[in-house]
UniProtKB/Swiss-Prot annotation:
The chain crosses the membrane at residues 439-459. It comes from Mus musculus (Mouse). SUPFAM superfamilies: Concanavalin A-like lectins/glucanases. Pfam families: Lectin_leg-like. This is Protein ERGIC-53-like. PROSITE patterns: L_LECTIN_LIKE. InterPro entries: ConA-like_dom_sf, Intracellular_Lectin-GPT, Lectin_leg. Residues 32-254 form the L-type lectin-like domain. Glycans are attached at residue 84. The gene is Lman1l. It is a single-pass type I membrane protein. It comes from the Eukaryota. Keywords: Disulfide bond, Glycoprotein, Lectin, Membrane, Signal, Transmembrane, Transmembrane helix.
Length: 505
């Protein structure tokens, strides 16, 4: 039998740690549930005029559609957002994305994420945490040492401390790590998980969109009672100022892993729904309600049936009207014939005492008026009968083609009449159809050239006459009694004439 002696304590401790780590990794992860009332993210992060749903903002915080700017890049500013609803579950996980940008290597006071018993309003100064009952993850960028800045610290106040409480009542630092979260090309992500009295803070660098997370602080055992509030705050100092933006704050409740609920197939859900409806129908039939027993008619089919019955009623009424109008027309014809017979008999029979002229004329006028009215009524009845008969005929019969033929013949007659009127209209001699009344270009240029030649001939002739008169004036010294020459033209001619010897003397 092989016997092992001299096993060192360090090896035993290492093996124990490996066993514990393997057992921890073998445990299934907790079940997560998204809590929308404790979360916010873009786009449309804030409702215009109403703020963030289920959250309140304080101080210099500026709400946008994509992010919450806790503090702008101005000195001595502070702002915060706090949840209006408390945390009702014992274990939770928060995923936060933020961006801190500003000039220089040294930043402002930084950003702090809180889980406290009571809600505060503004500020991220560490000294104020002593009066709070909670913890805070403090992203500090105000350290004077550039090499050690920025730093992430996990702080706790009275009531939420380690089980081995020191009793001094001051702020305790549970852990810290150095990560540069200022001026990153992508948002800086932080994951805070509280599960089974263990707090873990994991960070991503923000150099790429999917940087791997690294554990910054892992503290246990730590007891955090439910009923607290989440908050995020930031502040700037007197020396430097950064823009502090929170892009998203997502909260998840954690529960013990259990047997997964197998979702029912879609067909089973349909069967259950149909079975429930069948039971409801049976219950209604048992009560004897007629409305439930008679299935409702299809509204579209019902509308079509009503339309069909209405059409039949209309056609029946129109046929009755047609028959009544035809009978009325026959009665009118008989009445007209009877009145004509009576009128002829009254003309032939003459009383012994003679006719009264006024009475006879009045009687004849009344008879003519009555006959005319009867004729008009007969024509109106005939028109109504023909209209009703046409309406009664079904669509697609030959009478439509007869009507179209009649309309086309009328249009042809109108067009022929217009053509005849146009042909009979008087036209000037030499008029051609389609000829234009505008002047041709060649004729216009010919007259323009003729006018130009005449103008130049007139100017040349006038100039020769003027030169001739001036020569006579210079030779004789006397000017004929002609109309006075224009002074400007005379001076121009004199300038062009040479000086004679007599004028020089």
């Amino acid at each position: 039998m092989l016997e092992i002696r001299g096993l060192s304590p360090s090896l035993c401790l290492l093996s124990l740690l490996l066993v514990l780590h393997g057992a921890e990794r073998s445990q299934p992860p907790p079940r997560r549930r998204f809590e929308y009332k404790l979360s916010f993210k873009g786009p449309r992060l804030a409702v215009p005029g109403a703020g963030i749903p289920f959250w309140s903002h304080h101080g210099d915080a500026i709400l946008g559609l994509e992010e919450v700017r806790l503090v702008p890049s101005m000195k001595n500013r502070s702002g915060a957002v706090w949840s209006n609803i408390s945390v009702s579950f014992p274990s939770w996980e928060v995923e936060m994305q933020m961006r801190v940008t500003g000039p220089g290597r040294r930043g402002a006071q930084g950003v702090a994420m809180w889980y406290t018993k009571d809600r505060a309003q503004v500020g991220s100064v560490v000294e104020e945490l002593a009066s709070w009952d909670g913890i805070g993850i403090y992203f500090d960028s105000s350290t004077s040492d550039v090499q050690d800045s920025p730093v992430i610290r996990v702080l706790a106040s009275d009531g939420h401390d380690l089980q081995e409480q020191s009793g001094d009542g001051n702020v305790r630092e549970l852990g810290s790590c150095h990560r540069d979260f200022r001026n990153r090309p992508f948002p800086f992500r932080a994951r805070v998980t509280y599960w089974r009295q263990r707090l873990r803070v994991s960070l991503s660098g923000g150099l790429t969109p999917k940087d791997p997370e690294e554990v910054c602080v892992d503290v246990e055992p730590l007891f955090l009672a439910p009923g607290g509030f989440f908050g995020v705050s930031a502040a700037t100092g007197t020396l430097a100022a950064d823009d502090h933006d929170v892009l998203s704050f997502l909260t998840f409740s954690l529960r013990e892993p259990g047997p997964e609920e197998t979702p029912q197939p879609f067909m089973e859900k349909d069967q259950l729904l149909l079975a429930r409806k069948l039971e409801e129908l049976k219950a209604r039939l048992a009560l004897g309600t007629r409305e439930a027993s008679i299935p409702p008619l299809n509204p579209k089919a019902q509308e079509e049936g009503e339309r069909f019955f209405n059409l039949e009623d209309t056609l029946g009424r129109q046929s009755q009207i047609l028959q009544a109008l035809q009978a009325l027309s026959r009665q009118m014809a008989q009445a007209e014939k009877h009145w004509k017979q009576q009128l002829g008999s009254t003309v032939q029979v003459r009383p012994e005492g003679g006719w009264n002229t006024a009475k006879v004329s009045t009687l004849l006028y009344g008879q003519r008026t009555l006959i005319q009215a009867l004729q008009e009524m007969r024509e109106a009845a005939a028109r109504m009968a023909s209209g009703a008969h046409v309406f009664y005929l079904p669509v697609g019969t030959k009478h439509h083609f007869f009507e179209l033929d009649h309309i086309l013949s009328l249009l042809q007659k109108d067009l022929r009449g217009l053509v005849k009127k146009t042909a009979k209209a008087p036209r000037p001699s030499g008029w051609l159809l389609g000829s234009s009344t505008c002047l041709h270009t060649s004729i216009f240029l010919f007259f323009l050239l003729l006018q130009t030649v005449g103008f130049f001939c007139y100017v040349n002739f006038s100039r020769q006459e003027l030169d001739k008169r001036l020569q006579e004036y210079l030779s004789t010294g006397s000017l004929s009694l002609e109309p006075a020459l224009p002074i400007t033209r005379t001076i121009g001619v004199l300038r062009r004439q040479p000086i004679s010897p007599s004028m020089q003397a």
